[in-house]
Amino acid sequence: MNTLAPRLTDLAHGGGCGCKLAPSVLQQLLANQPAARPFAQLLVGNDMADDAAVWQVDDNTCVIATTDFFMPIVDDPRDFGRIAATNAISDVYAMGGKPILALAIVGMPINKLDSTTIAKILEGGASICAEAGIPVAGGHSIDSVEPIYGLAVIGLCHPSEVRRNGGVKAGDALILTKGIGVGIYSAAIKKNALPPGCYEEMIGSTTLLNRIGADLAADPDVHALTDVTGFGVLGHGLEMARASQLSLTLRLSAIPFLSQAYMLAEQGFITGASGRNWASYGADVVLPDDLPDWQRLLLADPQTSGGLLVACAPEKAGALVEKVRLAGYPLAGIVGTAAAGAAQIKVIS
C-alpha cells in the first residue's frame, strides 16, 4: 500500500446520497424483481419504497434491518465516516426503532489511499456508532476503484411503534426536522467554493443522529415517518404521498434550509442528482408558475443524512415541533399538510 493522500472527493464520481440510482431507474429495476411479501412476519419489504425491512418476531418485537453506503461527500476521512454512519443508522430511527448493532461495509482503492486515511474513515464511523450506543460488530471489506463506506444496521421496535412512510392521514401536518441543502454544499466543496463556516454547519447537520424518530414513533399522534435523503424533500415526500394515496402540499417559505443553500443554488452549485431526481418524478409535482429553476432543483437536492419528514395530527403539530427543537433539532418546523386527492405534491409559496 502506498502513502498517497489525494482528496477523497476526487476519487469518486459522485458523493453521499447523490450516488443513489435515479428514482425512475430504481423503480424499473425493482419492477422486475419478485415482491418479498409472501411471509406473514415481513411487515415491510422491498415493494413499499420504505426506509428499512421490518420482520415481526413475536407480539412484542420487530427486527428492523437496513443498509446504506456511499462514496465520499467530504475530503476529511473521519468526517466521511461519521456522515456515512449517521446516514445508515437513520433508517432504523425513521422506522420508529432503536439500533442495536452495525456491520461495516468497506470498499477502498488501496493503491490510492494509505492505511492511516482508511483507518480514520472507520474510526469516524465507529465514533457515531458509539454515540448511538451500538457496536460495530463486524463487516466486510474489498479493494474497490472508488472509496465506499457505510453500514448494515439492525434495530428493534415494538410492533405498535413501527412507522411506515405510508401511514399519512388526510389533514395531517408535515414536520421536517433538518435543513435542506447538503447536496448544494457538497457541490460547492467539489469546486472549493464553500463559504466560511458552511462546512461546520454541514457537518453539524449530517452527523446529528435522527434518534428523535424512536421517540416520535411512540406517540400515537405521529402517523408516518421517513428520512429525507438522496431523492430530496420532493422525492421522499412523493413516496409518502404514493404510499398513503394522498396529496401533500409543501409551503416553500416554511421549509428550513442550510444558511447559504439559496445563495449557492442561485449561483449554480447544483448536483447532477437534482436533475435526475426531477426527471424521475417531476410529472407528479405541481410548482408555482414563477418558481425559478434553481429553486425547483433545490427542492430535488439530494440530502445525505437528512432529517425526518413526520406526519402527525394537526392539533399536535406545534407541541411536537417544540419537542423536536428541544431535543436538538433547531431548524425543525411545520412545512406542509396532507389532503385527500391524487398522489402528488403541490408546492406553494
From Swiss-Prot:
Binds 1 Mg(2+) ion per monomer. This is Selenide, water dikinase. SUPFAM superfamilies: PurM C-terminal domain-like, PurM N-terminal domain-like. GO terms for cellular component: cytoplasm. Synthesizes selenophosphate from selenide and ATP. It catalyses: hydrogenselenide + ATP + H2O = selenophosphate + AMP + phosphate + 2 H(+). Belongs to the selenophosphate synthase 1 family. Class I subfamily. HAMAP family: SelD. Homodimer. Its EC number is 2.7.9.3. Its cofactor is Mg(2+). The record marks 20 as: Important for catalytic activity.
